Amino acid sequence: MGKIIGIDLGTTNSCVAIMEGNQVKVIENSEGARTTPSIIAYMDDNEVLVGAPAKRQSVTNPKNTLFAVKRLIGRRFEEKEVQKDIGLMPYSIIKADNGDAWVEAHGEKLAPPQVSAEVLRKMKKTAEDYLGEPVTEAVITVPAYFNDSQRQATKDAGRIAGLEVKRIINEPTAAALAFGLDKAEKGDRKIAVYDLGGGTFDVSIIEIADVDGEMQFEVLSTNGDTFLGGEDFDQRIIDYIIGEFKKEQGVDLSKDVLALQRLKEAAEKAKIELSSGQQTEINLPYITADASGPKHLNLKITRAKLEALVEDLVERTIEPCRIAIKDAGVKVSDIDDVILVGGQTRMPKVMEKVKEFFGKDPRRDVNPDEAVAVGAAIQGQVLSGDRKDVLLLDVTPLSLGIETLGGVMTKMINKNTTIPTKHAQVYSTADDNQGAVTIKVFQGEREMAAGNKLLGEFNLEGIPPAPRGVPQIEVTFDIDANGILHVGAKDKATGKENKITIKANSGLSEAEIDQMIKDAEANAAEDHKLRELADSRNQGDALVHSTKKALTEYGDKLDAGEKEAIEAALKSLEDVLKDTSADKAAIDAKVEELGKVSQKLGEKMYADMQAQQAGAAGAAGAAEGAAHAGGAQQAADDVVDAEFKEVKKD
């Protein structure tokens, strides 16, 4: 059985790790980096770029370069968070036929799981290159506050990438695993994981207990905001730059997608620089042009200005911390350690706010970019049976329930319940002789069902006629270890049953996923064909070069007919190499043809080289003989025998 890899599928960056024995290994990608930008570019020639190569060309291809797609995964187009992003992203966010938020590149509609699968495929390939064997299983992390649709969509992305997702685990929990197993401290302790990433924010309160030599990680509570992260911090800087430029130059850059892409890069860079410096300069020459000529952007930003721009965003992370502490039934003073995860936590203002709330300095010995992937790899080792000393008890982040009479949300499983869990409850009909009931499943904390997220609905039909309130319908909620919900309804009188895994009226159907898997496999086959074609072209180019060189040196030793045949075959190969539509077979045929007619030329070269070597060997032998004769007397005087051996070369 192959290794189960751990993947942190991030909004901004992704990371892959594996366990080697009890040592964790974060794997470098083909560019030599330990994290890969979660950026996917669709090129004109159907090539798909992932990671750093996609990021490098984003300025010139903004409409077809997709980033922060994780913010859309498992979301409906109408959601206010999606609507907010439509105005900010240089690429198109569109409404799919099922009402989900999809994206568009080169006129092709793409589901977010399909796009995220490209990043997962890159992570899979990174691990395979390192291990030298195929990888088929993975543990993938998600924000703790992801709802059922978002978890299901992440699992779908794994399938499309050719991975069997053994477990979906929460990012803060994964970071706690990485932290807990790295420390030698014994005894029970409570930790807070504050995870502010590129697109999402989570906070989890976790108890690490030592139970008979086994490390038990129990999540006491979790809270967060799945639409708050580093991307929002970047956007504040972008908006500020646009405003300042408009004041100075009278030009609105927000309508210029090329300029926006350059601004995004500059904003991210400025934000990072201001984590260590007090001031930075944004310098973008030729950012745009008007009738008076080109315009250049030059702007200084201080750390104080940045902090003022994002103050409310940092403040927004504190309320979820307060709720998580309350839900866990602990006091702030009970927290032994605070762990920071996610690149945005490097901002001094964020660290300061966290210290202010928790009353202690956050730990600095956890790598905020890699801890989540490390934790996922540890969980992979646990699931493969190679590690027995770790037990993970996670929770469901949001309450789950059904809509009952009057549009009320009746909770079946409360938030922060340890998973896996199962709950059954008996309901009845609202009308006399009601033959069917529709079960609508919701996730959220609002009292009325309409204020929560509708996960899906299904019907239980064939209920025998009876007065209202008489039929006994048992509804069962079952949450698996991935945090994914399975619901069943059963008429206790007839035994009729209807079960669903929540797919909602959104999400991808099995047929769509299968098609995407086929497309991905076809792309892999196409990539292989393109690589083989490139190899043939390279072989052809090399043969053209070597044949031309040989003709220059030895062409005069050939008969006129032989030389003409070679020149004709050479031209034929050059023509086919110039033809961009030529396939591998056509190139290979011309390479073979030139190889055959060049045989005589090769023989002439070989014979010439042999003659040269024989001549050189003969001259060397004669020189050695003369030296031997002339030095004989001296050798005798010195009483040293010098032996010479001539080596004949074939």
From Swiss-Prot:
Family statement drawn from the similarity comment of this UniProt entry: Belongs to the heat shock protein 70 family.
Annotated InterPro entries: ATPase_NBD, Chaperone_DnaK, Heat_shock_70_CS, HSP70_C_sf, HSP70_peptide-bd_sf, Hsp_70_fam
Ranges where the record places region Disordered: 614-634
Protein name: Chaperone protein DnaK
UniProt lineage: Bacteria, Pseudomonadati, Pseudomonadota, Betaproteobacteria, Burkholderiales
Function, in words: Acts as a chaperone.
Modified residues (Phosphothreonine): T200
Keyword entries, A-Z: ATP-binding, Chaperone, Nucleotide-binding, Phosphoprotein, Stress response
Gene3D superfamilies: 1.20.1270.10, 3.30.420.40, Actin, Chain A, domain 4, Substrate Binding Domain Of DNAk, Chain A, domain 1
